[in-house]
């Protein structure tokens, strides 16, 4: 491809709203243009990269035995109402009405549609197993779209859905997709980790995310420094405390604490360590009641763990001060488990405390030297805290370390979550009707492009991993418009490279060499060849790899050998 026949839309200016390097570089390299908040046009250069990623995804899905189809973007409200997600999905679901006042939505995902297909088309166990996938535009009405295509409202996604007769078959399909995802991200040249994850709005019982490691990632990846354990911090388990709780020493005592509202203030007032106090958080129950969650003073609540607790509302909702005062008689800064008039759940680490401090459920008063069972019944105990870097890994091997990650894919074991609600069944070999066992598997194709840039760039621009590069070779002539020899040599080499199967971008613009070099570095083409009069005099071409700082001279007759 010659630049004169291509749309090269590089710019020097960085948009004011572009914070991440990937967003800045995708705009400057002419890959994207913003249409509206969270909506982007993929220009020809960007589309080439997007299609490269989609091609790798498609090849590996086909290799894994999945079958491609294409479902509508617009979906009937009735399907989402049937699954129970019409209201539960929240404001990210863009709801619309047609001219006949029928409700629809722009699909953020396609579990309902594929389950509807399955219940209509699948009748017998003999048709199983099956796995369908599509690569298609999705829409989620993000409250605050940001970071370019990293968190946009419209995006390209690969979503797949497996159907099996039983749980064993579903697990086998899950493992097959898990392995396919590993191959996809390995082929794309990304540094990634597969981590245990929460199932979120999709649902199901078991899930992994695929996280591209990058300092700007929104997710915290937790991993052991001595084992294969890895999880999103939302899912990371805190190891249960070891040993028996020691016996109490001091007598419980109420102290006046005027103005004390936080653990730090209590620690300063009572001269105690934060880890010797407990904090009490009030959340809403699933039947309008209130429930207290009690943690050690130096720990933070893991909202995802909490909202999966029996009796706790999903999604998690904190009670406001008015509700707390009506139920307990004090403000949020004076709460504690002693004589608490509502049910409470204690974190496992807080349950090990001896002679601890807590609110007295009376404004401006706290208890010190409180002990479980002696002064207050322990009640329910669960793992509800966020893990802390340096914690012992839950598998007992090594310590937990943290890294930042960008989620580019997730796989789920759905079981019969959708098939049961939508009555998707098949008849087994005994003639018995059974609910289909499902899995679903997503890859953010457009987000993967941005994540790759976050891992692969420098001060000059993008450094594409080879499988994602829009072109393989940049051919840059020096003063071609003044030199017949340079033009002729370029024409000959360009045709040889094309005939050899390489994707070449020939910069045939009437521009200064520095401008052309800067543009080729910015758009990140892996290999650059420079042809000049002085080089031709010596029978050489200058070769430079994008990821290298040094150029080298290559014989004009042996240029193709560089790429073999």
From Swiss-Prot:
Q: Which GO terms describe its biological process?
A: prolyl-tRNA aminoacylation
Q: Where can this protein be found?
A: Cytoplasm
- Provide a Gene Ontology MF annotation, just one: proline-tRNA ligase activity
Report the EC code(s) recorded for this entry.
6.1.1.15
- TM ranges are none
Sorted keywords for this record are: Aminoacyl-tRNA synthetase, ATP-binding, Cytoplasm, Ligase, Nucleotide-binding, Protein biosynthesis
Sorted alphabetically, the Gene Ontology cellular component annotations on this record are: cytosol
Reaction equation(s) it catalyzes: tRNA(Pro) + L-proline + ATP = L-prolyl-tRNA(Pro) + AMP + diphosphate
What role does it play? Answer: Catalyzes the attachment of proline to tRNA(Pro) in a two-step reaction: proline is first activated by ATP to form Pro-AMP and then transferred to the acceptor end of tRNA(Pro). As ProRS can inadvertently accommodate and process non-cognate amino acids such as alanine and cysteine, to avoid such errors it has two additional distinct editing activities against alanine. One activity is designated as 'pretransfer' editing and involves the tRNA(Pro)-independent hydrolysis of activated Ala-AMP.
Family membership: Belongs to the class-II aminoacyl-tRNA synthetase family. ProS type 1 subfamily.
Domain topic, free-text comment: Consists of three domains: the N-terminal catalytic domain, the editing domain and the C-terminal anticodon-binding domain.
Quaternary form?
A: Homodimer.
Q: What is this protein called?
A: Proline--tRNA ligase
Q: Which organism is it from?
A: Coxiella burnetii (strain RSA 331 / Henzerling II)
């Amino acid at each position: 491809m010659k630049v004169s026949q291509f749309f090269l839309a590089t710019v020097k200016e960085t948009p004011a709203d572009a914070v991440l390097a990937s967003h800045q570089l995708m705009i400057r390299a002419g890959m994207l243009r913003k249409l509206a908040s969270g909506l982007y046009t993929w220009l020809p250069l960007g589309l080439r990269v997007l299609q490269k990623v989609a091609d790798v995804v498609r090849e590996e899905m086909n290799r894994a035995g999945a079958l491609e189809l294409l479902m509508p973007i617009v979906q009937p409200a009735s399907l989402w109402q049937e699954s129970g997600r019409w209201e539960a999905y929240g404001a990210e679901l863009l709801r619309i009405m047609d001219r006949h006042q029928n409700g629809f939505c722009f699909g953020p995902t396609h579990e309902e549609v594929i389950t509807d297909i399955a219940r209509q088309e699948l009748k017998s166990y003999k048709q199983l197993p099956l796995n369908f996938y599509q690569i298609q535009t999705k829409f989620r009405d993000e409250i605050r779209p940001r970071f370019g295509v990293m968190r946009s409202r419209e995006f390209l996604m690969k979503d797949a859905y497996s159907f099996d007769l039983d749980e064993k078959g579903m697990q086998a399909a899950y493992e097959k997709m898990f392995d396919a995802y590993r191959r996809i991200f390995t082929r794309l040249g990304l540094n990634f980790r597969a981590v245990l994850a929460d199932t979120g709005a999709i649902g199901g019982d078991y899930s992994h995310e695929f996280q591209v490691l990058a300092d700007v990632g929104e997710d915290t990846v937790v991993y052991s420094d001595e084992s294969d354990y890895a999880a999103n911090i939302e899912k990371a388990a805190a190891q249960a405390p070891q040993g028996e709780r020691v016996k109490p020493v001091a007598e419980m005592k109420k102290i006046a604490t005027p103005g004390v509202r936080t653990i730090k203030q209590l620690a300063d007032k009572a001269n105690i360590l934060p880890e010797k106090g407990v904090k009490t958080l009030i959340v809403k129950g699933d039947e309008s009641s209130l429930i207290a969650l009690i943690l050690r003073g130096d720990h933070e609540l893991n909202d995802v763990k909490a909202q999966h607790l029996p009796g706790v509302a999903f999604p998690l909702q904190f009670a406001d001060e008015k509700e707390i005062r009506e139920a307990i008689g004090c403000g949020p800064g004076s709460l504690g488990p002693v004589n608490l008039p509502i049910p409470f759940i204690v974190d496992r680490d807080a349950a090990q405390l001896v002679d601890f401090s807590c609110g007295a459920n009376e404004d401006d008063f706290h208890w010190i030297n409180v002990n479980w069972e002696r002064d207050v019944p322990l009640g329910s105990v669960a793992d509800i805290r966020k893990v802390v870097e340096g914690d012992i890994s839950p598998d007992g091997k090594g310590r937990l370390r943290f890294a930042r990650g960008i989620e580019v894919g997730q796989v789920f074991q759905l079981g019969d979550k959708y098939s049961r609600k939508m009555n998707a069944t098949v008849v087994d070999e005994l003639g018995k009707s059974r609910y289909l066992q499902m899995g679903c598997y997503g890859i953010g194709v457009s987000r993967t492009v941005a994540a790759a840039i976050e891992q692969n760039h420098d001060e000059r621009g993008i450094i594409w991993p080879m499988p994602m590069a829009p072109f393989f070779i940049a051919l840059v002539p020096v003063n071609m418009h003044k030199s017949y020899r340079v033009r002729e040599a370029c024409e000959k080499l360009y045709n040889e490279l094309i005939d050899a199967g390489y994707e070449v971008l020939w910069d045939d613009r009437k521009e200064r060499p520095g401008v052309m070099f800067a543009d080729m570095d910015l758009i990140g083409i892996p290999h650059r060849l420079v042809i000049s009069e002085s080089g031709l005099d010596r029978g050489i071409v200058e070769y430079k790899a994008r990821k290298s700082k040094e150029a080298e001279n290559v014989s004009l007759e042996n240029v193709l050998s560089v790429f073999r």
